[in-house]
């Protein structure tokens, strides 16, 4: 019984140490943390009137609008037809 317990403990220790090595190697290879999108949503601007649109406010009343996104500046634009 003691032999089985010793083997289980050794296997657990080896698996923990092997996991630590692989995670350390991944950090040293990467060299930087990944960049994430900001928490706040991007702003939406109506192209015809130039006004900011918030939540469900209609920017271009009575006109059909297309939404375009500029990922570099995180801005969404509405083009009104």
Curated annotation (Swiss-Prot):
UniProt KW Ribonucleoprotein keyword: no
Listed GO cellular component terms? extracellular region
Keywords from the UniProt entry: Disulfide bond, Knottin, Secreted, Signal, Toxin
- Signal peptide as annotated in the record: 1-19
User: Does Disulfide bond count among this protein's keywords?
Assistant: yes
* Disulfide bonding pattern of the chain: 46-60, 53-65, 59-80
Question: Where in the cell is the protein located?
Answer: Secreted
> Which stretches are tagged as propeptide in the UniProt entry?
20-42
Q: Which GO terms describe its molecular function?
A: toxin activity
- Summary of the tissues where the protein is detected: Expressed by the venom duct.
Can you tell me which family this protein belongs to? Belongs to the conotoxin I3 superfamily.
Write out the domain note.
Answer: The presence of a 'disulfide through disulfide knot' structurally defines this protein as a knottin. The cysteine framework is VI/VII (C-C-CC-C-C).
Q: Could you identify this protein by its name?
A: Conotoxin Lt6.4
């Amino acid at each position: 019984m003691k032999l089985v317990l010793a083997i289980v403990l050794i296997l657990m220790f080896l698996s923990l140490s092997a996991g630590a090595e692989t995670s350390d190697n991944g950090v040293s290879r990467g060299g930087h943390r990944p960049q994430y999108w900001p928490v706040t949503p991007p702003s939406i601007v109506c192209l015809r009137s130039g006004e900011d649109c918030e939540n469900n406010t209609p920017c271009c009343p009575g006109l059909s609008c297309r939404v375009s996104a500029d990922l570099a500046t995180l801005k969404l634009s509405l083009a009104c037809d």
